[in-house]
Structure formats: C-alpha cells, structure tokens
Amino acid sequence: MAAPYYEFVVLRLQFGSQMGRLLGWLEKRALPLFQKHRFGSMGFFTVEVGPHIPAVFGILTYPSFAEMDAAWARMDADHDYAAAVAELEKDEPAFYREDTSILRATSFSPPLKPAAPGDPMHKLYELRIYESPTQRQLGYLHDRFAGGEIEMFHKSGIHPVLYADTIIGPNRPNMAYLIPFESEAHREKAWAVFRDNPDWQQLRAESIRRGGEIVRNITNMFLVPTSFSMIR
C-alpha cells in the first residue's frame, strides 16, 4: 500500500486583525470545497509559537501523490473555488505569504485520522521538524525512532499522530512529527519524563556512534486547533 502524503501550508499574516477574516474564509468557503473534492483529513490551526507569527497552519492529507494531483485538478476546475479565491483576495489581502511543503509518511507513522464525534479537543499540538545533514543520516534517524524512541515516547505520555519526511520544501532532508497534548503542563511533564529516561540517553548515544550528529537543527511550532479543524 502506498504511503500517505501530506501538504503542510503556513499562511503568514502581517497583522493580527487579518486572522478573523482568514479563519472565516477557511471555514465557510474553503473547507466545503475541500470536502466536495474529496480531500482527506484536514487540520487547521493557529500558530502560537513558531518562526512566523501571526500565522495559520493547515494540513491536507492524500492517499497518494497521484490523488493529491487529482484533487487539486478538480479544485482548480471548480468555478466556485475561483470565486472563493477572488472573494478572499478582494480589497486588502488576508495574508502576505503562503509556504507549502509536501511530505510522505514514514513506514512507522500511524494514519492521521479525523476526530470522532464527541472526542475531546486537544488544547495544544506540537510540530517538531528534525533536519539531518544528509539523506543517509535521515535514515539513521528513522532507525532510531523505529528502534525504540517511539516506544519510549508512548511510555512518557507522548503520542505522535504522524511522522513524515519532507520531499518538497525547505531544509531537506528532514522529518516532521506532530504531537497532541491536553495542556502545556501535560507537555512539560511528558517531555521531562522522556528526557530523564536513561534508556533514551543510551539510545541517543548509540545513534551518534553509528551515524554522527544525525539531527543538526530542530524547529518547534506550537499549534492550537480551530473549532472547525477535523484534526483536533
């Protein structure tokens, strides 16, 4: 079975006052069109901490690269989509820059699923992006995660909902993973338990022995799901 693909979109705002207009458009105009043209699970978040704020972060999911191309072809041919974009771009712009990356799920990633009716909304998501110096060293990073790090995550109360490699986008090679938390306190406690685990220290040392410094830079983003996000 082909690995799922993800589209990460960051919409950078120039002013905080643009946020309400952009979120309203995403909920009322864009989301129904995404659903009409059979896009997969979708997440929409405000960026609370990240390289660029204020910003809106979106995740679109596809079962394959071919289906991603087909979904956007259907969207681009829809006159309602053209009208919605024209409405958004009328008068003052709702954002000043769009950054898009395409990612492919790793072999050890769980499927990214929408929340079921009645599921509680997580207060916070953490997106972590690990940059490796080379593709070979990214492979060692995969080995470390699949070889024990994920199990240690779960024992510490850290439960990522996806792991994916960027195939089109900046700072490649890199791997991203997304973690839901009930609160900032939950996050701090879980990471403290993980960091203090001697097995983690041993696993990290072994990965460095095998592949050198396999992670050269880490980018963190704290995301808050919107009321209309399917991933919440």
What does each model-found stretch correspond to?
Residues 1-232:
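Short S/T/G/P-rich N-terminal loop/turn motif that feeds into the first structured element of a domain
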